[in-house]
């Protein structure tokens, strides 16, 4: 006999959540949402000044003890391993990992430099493997953990001039499945959120481009850009006990873009 699920299943009180690339934009909003749901959050970035400013803002609203900052390069395995060890020793075991760090590089493929291809793939795909594996070692041992990889509509679609990005995000979708396949038996759930076109300070130039803005509004059934707030609820769900039987999935939060032609 089934019983109704309590909203307590979404409560993250006592959980430690590491969110990569969280000093600004989408990552910052996701970390803020997890903290609002009760989690102790560890912010990450490589710009120490911006990271400290974000931590100070969060601490003022969520409490000093529930907000921490770890500056490390998600593509450097030695830094990642050291940072994860320090977080687990000083803050506590990592219960939730959000692999959000990402970069974009727009150029036609015939003009794309190999170094730029490698940089985008390293940040957008390889970092999720490096950080995910480092954190999952503890999760598997404890037999409990949640990994949320931030993909994109480009996990499913392609668009001209962003070949390394769409390749990396497509790879991230299958990396998510691989994590579920290998770690699911240890009660680790790995899922992906695939945002559509989200209005942030990092996409403001696209919003300001009249032709591109018209394309987004016309291509999206919701007829609007998404907001960071649209991604918070799904992230809390995938980080919580409410999603314990969800594994290896990609949730598209795109206003219906990938549902239509």
Predicted segments with their positions:
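Conserved glycine-rich cofactor-binding loop
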Residues: 16, 23-25
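Residue(s) in the substrate-gating loop at a strand-loop-helix junction
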Residues: 152
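Short C-terminal tail/terminal secondary-structure segment
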Residues: 2-8, 157, 235-236, 247-261
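Conserved glycine-rich Rossmann-like NAD(P)H-binding loop of the short-chain dehydrogenase/reductase
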Residues: 37-54
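Alpha-helical segment proximal to the catalytic Tyr-Lys
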Residues: 137, 181-185, 244
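Active-site helix of classical SDR
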Residues: 132, 168, 176
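Substrate-binding pocket helix/loop in short-chain dehydrogenase/reductase
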Residues: 108-109, 116-121, 147, 216
């Amino acid at each position: 006999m089934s019983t109704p699920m309590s909203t307590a299943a979404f409560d993250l009180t006592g959980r430690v959540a590491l969110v990569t690339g969280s000093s600004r934009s989408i990552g910052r909003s996701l970390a803020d949402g997890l903290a609002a749901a009760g989690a102790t959050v560890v912010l990450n970035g490589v710009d120490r000044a911006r990271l400290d400013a974000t931590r100070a803002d969060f601490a003022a609203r969520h409490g000093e003890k529930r907000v921490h900052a770890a500056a490390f390069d998600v593509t450097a395995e030695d830094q990642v391993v050291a940072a994860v060890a320090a977080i687990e020793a000083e803050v506590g075991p990592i219960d939730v990992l959000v692999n959000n760090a990402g970069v974009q590089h727009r150029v036609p493929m015939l003009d794309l430099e190999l170094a730029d291809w490698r940089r985008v793939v390293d940040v957008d795909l390889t970092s999720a493997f490096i950080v995910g594996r480092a954190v999952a070692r503890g999760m598997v041992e404890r037999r409990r953990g949640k990994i949320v990889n931030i993909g994109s509509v480009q996990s499913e679609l392609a668009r001209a001039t962003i070949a390394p990005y769409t390749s990396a995000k497509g790879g991230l979708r299958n990396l998510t499945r691989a994590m579920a396949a290998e770690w699911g038996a240890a009660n680790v759930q790995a899922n992906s959120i695939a945002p559509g076109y989200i209005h942030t300070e990092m996409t403001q130039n696209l919003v300001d481009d009249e032709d591109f803005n018209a394309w987004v509004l016309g291509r999206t059934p919701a007829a609007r850009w998404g907001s960071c707030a649209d991604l918070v609820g799904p992230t809390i769900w995938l980080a919580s006990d409410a999603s314990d039987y969800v594994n290896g999935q990609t949730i598209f939060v795109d206003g219906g873009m990938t549902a239509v032609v």
